[in-house]
Regions:
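Short helix/loop segments within enzyme catalytic domains
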Residues: 80-101, 173-229, 259, 269-271
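Catalytic Zn2+-binding segment of zinc metalloproteases
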Residues: 139, 149-165, 195-198
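Pan-zinc metallopeptidase signature
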Residues: 224-276
């Protein structure tokens, strides 16, 4: 990970990650210890190894099936297919320290705006929904793409880490808190790449709004002010179960990190090339 990227990690991400690692490791040790306390520890250990191998084979097979679905039902970005978007992926990946860009796909989401980063076996992937590409312009898409690639760069999809931490995922509220910190980290890393930080604010706000015709009329400051309307206790109770912070907080945090003057864009895209 490039040093200039790591400084944008949320302070709580490392703490929650360390807690997951420690608790997960301790629980794995307890599981192994319980095996050796059985009446026939050798048989129990063999059974554990067999179940582990079966699970590993099943996960590999499911990953292969999912990739087959992506290749057969989605559109792969390349130099020949949507070269402008593909160039953004390559440029963002290079700036974040990846020699090879993740394989990128666009799929028909039937109106759902989303993007996600995946790690299947050793392959890195980023998926964009059609609704997202339709609603956001190229600068906003650069932010979304940077956010998803940051998940790969910051090690959020590391299989070994997930395995060690897996038992701790069942500790109430711990994994969601860690996940929310990761989202803040990726927002900051991606915003760092943009010359116009306002594009990061509006890109996030578009995920809440979703209306293409309103893209160039959004006010991030007004959006952040919605936090004043949030019932404190209800807002807290809702968020502690979520993997992502609420959007108003994500926009507010970016404004606190970067010298952003939140303004509404003064023009709409002048051509089809400007629009995503």
């Amino acid at each position: 990970m490039p040093p200039h990227i790591s400084i944008y990690q949320h302070p709580q991400e490392k703490g929650y990650g360390a807690a997951l690692t420690v608790i997960g490791s301790a629980l794995w040790l307890l599981i192994i210890l319980s095996v050796f306390l059985q009446k026939n520890p050798v048989a129990a250990l063999i059974a554990l190894v067999i179940y582990g191998l079966l699970l590993w084979v099943m996960m590999k097979f499911m990953a292969a099936l999912f990739r087959a679905w992506m290749v057969g039902s989605m559109v792969v970005l390349s130099e020949q297919q949507f070269p402008e978007l593909h160039a953004i992926f390559v440029d963002v990946s290079r700036k974040l320290g990846l020699e090879t860009a993740p394989e990128a796909f666009i799929y028909n989401s039937h109106g759902v705006m989303n993007a996600l980063a995946l790690r299947l076996s050793r392959g890195r992937y980023v998926l964009l929904t059609s609704a997202l590409v339709e609603a956001e312009d190229n600068a906003q898409l650069r932010f979304v793409i940077g956010h998803e690639i940051a998940h790969h760069v910051l090690g959020h999809l590391n299989s070994a880490k997930h395995f060690i931490r897996y038992p701790a995922f069942f500790v109430p509220f711990l994994y969601p808190a860690y996940s929310r910190a990761r989202e803040y980290s990726c927002d900051a890393v991606s915003a760092f790449l943009l010359e116009d930080k306002n594009q990061a604010l509006t890109a996030l706000q578009m995920l809440a709004c979703g209306a293409k015709r309103l893209n160039y009329e959004m006010s991030p400051s007004a959006f952040i002010d919605q936090e004043k309307l949030m019932p404190a206790f209800a807002g807290f109770c809702r968020e502690i179960f979520l993997s992502h912070p609420r959007m108003t907080r994500r926009v507010a945090r970016l404004m606190s990190l970067f010298p952003i003057v939140a303004v509404k864009p003064d023009r709409a895209p002048s051509s089809a090339q400007d629009a995503a």
